[in-house]
Amino acid sequence: MKSLLYPAIALMNRLSFGMKFSLISVLFFVPMGVTNFYLLKQAYEEFQVTRIELQGLDLLSQSFKLRQDVQSYYDLVQINAIIISSTGGRSSELDSQIAALEASIGQALQALSPASNDDEAIQIFVAKRDEMLSMLKAAKAEAVPLGKVEFVEKLQSSSLLFSKLISTQSYLAQDADVELRQLTELIIAYTPRVAALLSDARATSAAAMGQKMLDSGMAGKLDMLMGDMEKMHAEYGLALDEAVQRVPKLAEVLGSSANDSLAALKSIPELVDGQVIMAAELVAPWKDIYALIGEGVEKSYRLDAAVMDLLQSELSERLISKRNQMILLLVALSAVFLIIVYLYGAFYVSTRSSLKGLGTIMHKVAGGDMTVRFDAKSQDELGELGEVFNGSVAQIRQLIERVG
């Protein structure tokens, strides 16, 4: 064993006590400090991610409102284009609604700001937002109704992708919690598709009512939409069931919002079939069918809002928890570090004091004073050495007394 330790013993024998102590202190405190730093860094990063997710949730809510306005804008532009092409006249009410939505969408886009702190993510966000502003500007400037529809269709597709971009940049889509990812997927991947299908049915049905006839093109489109809604009903139902299974409290929190949104995929096709496809004549105002189907679309939006409220609650609780964990970790690590430094320093001072005291006593003994005694205050090996020294001095004193 001694041969194994010989290199270290040789090194220590070359160093003074202070140098030995300093070397051991460096080898102990540097790794400890690095470890504490990374523990605190990890806790802070988790706190920051949660805060960005909360900020991203507010931004996602704004993008949902934007998407709803863009969807309504797209529907009204389609209806307006078909009415103009079939009747040759314009509706001042439609024009005013479209103009109001254009102003609202423009203001909403300009108010959006990225939640991420990453420069590359900010550039991507700003580029996508500016692209949508350019699309809106082009749509507003387009005088041909069908040309306007094409621009708004691109804007509508971009609004869907924009929500996905926000969920990715704010870490909601990559969250470590499976339940939170499930909820995010529900409002990013499913409810937008449901709302888009219902909105397409709303626009096509209202346009047919507006031109007072259902031509073959519209009839074919409605048949296709009804088939898509039937498929979506099954897929959407499975997604909702899976979400409820993974997040048991989801059913209680959402209440009837999920069932209402799912039921709309059944009730709207029946409504369209009865009032548009199978109707003997289309005499009702287009606004009536638009409002009726719009109620089904609103059910999906209400589900989005309910899920967003749940996410807001979960992330707010997590943010408080992460902040408390970070503070407790900082306090605990600091306390441990300070206690170690305090005890380490006390050990150094105690050892130095014992060695100095022993040296002083030995100096007096060397001067001939055999009456001195080393007062050992420590109970360690130095204390034992002091007791041995006292015994040796006592024996020497006895020998001197015998000789005398």
Question: Where in the sequence are the language-model features?
Answer:
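HAMP domain helices
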Residues: R51-I52, S321-G404
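Hydrophobic alpha-helical segments
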Residues: M1-F337, V341-R352
